[in-house]
């Protein structure tokens, strides 16, 4: 599996890894993974991992750095479609109002990714679309985003349908 890994630390001593991995065959149907490969497309997962937990909140400066790295990677890979799945592995600091409304951790991360994606798009010199995918997985909501060039919107839609079909089984 092809991957690109970036590591960096914040001033509090937390170490972060940004990993982009061409891992479409993990969750796409074999037919679609083969189709994408034949057409020269690659689906890259975006993974941000924190080692250590000195600072509970990921600083905006660090998120901006992550955005810049993703933008640079995207520019260098013209047939890449990126995806990010918003998980609920660890809690995130939310305002009291958001907690009161029952906002899920995944939904909070979903909104954050949408904002960060807008920053990434401003750095790029190409038209980019965000294809959000929401799946109601029996109480464990799943939020996924596909980031693709506008000229690949049809491919992003095919991927979205394939993901939905996989979860519907």
Where are each of the predicted segments found?
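Non-catalytic substrate-recognition and accessory regions of acyl/acetyltransferase enzymes
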Residues: 1-169
